[in-house]
Curated annotation (Swiss-Prot):
Source organism of this protein record: Pseudomonas entomophila (strain L48)
Compartments in which it is found: Cytoplasm
Catalytic activity: DNA(n) + a 2'-deoxyribonucleoside 5'-triphosphate = DNA(n+1) + diphosphate
Function in brief: Poorly processive, error-prone DNA polymerase involved in untargeted mutagenesis. Copies undamaged DNA at stalled replication forks, which arise in vivo from mismatched or misaligned primer ends. These misaligned primers can be extended by PolIV. Exhibits no 3'-5' exonuclease (proofreading) activity. May be involved in translesional synthesis, in conjunction with the beta clamp from PolIII.
InterPro entries reported in the protein's UniProt record: DNA/RNA_pol_sf, DNA_pol_Y-fam_lit_finger_sf, DNA_pol_Y-fam_little_finger, DNA_polymerase-Y, DNApol_IV, IMS_HHH_1, Rev_trsase/Diguanyl_cyclase, UmuC
The EC number(s) this enzyme carries: 2.7.7.7
Entry's family note: Belongs to the DNA polymerase type-Y family.
Superkingdom in the source lineage: Bacteria
Cofactor, how bound (note): Binds 2 magnesium ions per subunit.
Residues reported to bind Mg(2+): D10, D105
Protein name as annotated: DNA polymerase IV
Length: 354
């Protein structure tokens, strides 16, 4: 079994969190995102105050209001959720390019080869949580484990706003006490069949030989045998369609002022243009952007639709970005958003566990 470092990030009640962030009046009271009851609406997600009344995702809005008469239901704002998701993925890409999005609010990261924090996946997860809270003003839960199956379980272990780590030496004991219903791919039908066979935990499942499980469950029996032992060889499937291309550099000595930053632009743009030239023809460069990280680790990104990709356009963007902080700079980045000419579109998982 290969040893990898996998992080599963799951935003806490994502749609609701964005609404409460943008409208503080909603915070601290039961609220949900979804359709109105008079229109046969359905709850997309709700905050934890509403969950205390039994309100859940995919519940009819009318039923939710019966459970919680004071529930405030707001219309979804999908573009706001997409924008927040893009910002979160920008943070992810600082640590690894191996990112598998599951929905707007959930993703796997493979940080096995990351050099951040001397390769500590736990510290990377902590830093991601800190940066999301600081920059987006919402919380995420994180799970760290040697594989995807365990990382996803771990992220749910201390929700909301939690971090749980399963180290390789803890896998066998941790998995043994797991209910079989928590296993990846085990739905109600399979869970009921396992219960009829007297199998309620992974410890009990381990008593069954591999061939016996295959006889009972077909090819999924092989999967059950492995999961009961904490084995999951699925790789993080990187998102093959890029949203941007960029280059950045962290300087040994902080750049003290705007002019010293502007002097670095030609070299950065030369590297960026080399990367763009290597891309296939299914992408078209779109909006240019610059990224500035100041000496105190605060950062800002400036982009402009319709601007050119020439040196003067980037000089203007950098000048505007620098003005937001006006402090010595430790990192500069330049890039361009990409338009996917294949027409790929992002799917919203409205009724997922969000």
């Amino acid at each position: 079994m290969s040893l990898r470092k996998i992080i599963h990030i799951d935003c806490d009640c994502f749609y609701a969190a964005i609404e409460m962030r943008d409208d503080p009046r909603l915070a601290g009271r039961p609220m949900a995102v979804g359709g109105q009851p008079g229109q046969r609406g359905v709850i997309a997600t709700c905050n934890y105050e509403a969950r205390a009344y039994g309100v859940r995702s995919a519940m009819a809005s009318g039923h939710a209001l019966k459970l919680c008469p004071d529930l405030e239901i707001v219309k979804p704002r999908f573009e706001a959720y997409r924008e927040a998701s893009r910002d979160i993925h920008t943070i992810f890409r600082d640590y690894t390019d191996l990112i598998e999005p599951l929905s707007l609010d959930e993703a796997y990261l493979d940080v096995t080869d990351s050099q951040w924090f001397a390769g500590s996946a736990t510290r990377i997860a902590e830093d991601i949580r800190r940066r999301v809270a600081q920059q987006l003003h919402i919380t995420v839960s994180a799970g760290v484990a040697p594989n995807k199956f365990l990382a996803k379980i771990a992220s749910d272990w201390r929700k909301p706003n939690g971090l749980f780590v399963i180290t390789p030496d803890q896998v066998e004991e941790f998995v043994a006490q797991l209910p079989v219903a928590r296993l990846h791919g085990v739905g109600k039908v399979t869970a009921d069949k396992l219960a009829r066979l007297g199998i309620d935990t992974c410890h009990a499942l381990r008593d069954w030989p591999r061939l016996a499980l295959v006889r009972e469950f077909g090819s999924f029996g092989e999967r059950l045998w492995g999961l009961a032992r904490g084995i999951d060889e699925r790789a993080v499937q990187n998102d093959s369609r890029r949203q941007s291309v960029s280059v950045e550099n962290t300087y040994d000595h902080d750049l003290p002022d705007l002019n010293s930053c502007l002097e670095k632009l030609p070299e950065l743009l030369s590297s960026l243009n080399e990367r763009i030239a290597r891309m296939d023809s299914s992408y078209r460069p779109d909006k240019p952007f610059v990224k500035v990280k100041f000496h105190d680790f605060s950062q800002t990104t400036m982009e402009q639709a319709g601007a050119g990709r020439d040196l003067e356009s980037y000089r203007q963007l950098l000048s505007q970005a620098f003005a937001r902080g006006g402090k010595p700079v430790r990192l500069l980045g330049v890039g361009v958003r990409l338009r996917d000419l294949r027409g790929a579109h992002e799917q919203l998982e409205l009724f997922g566990d969000i």
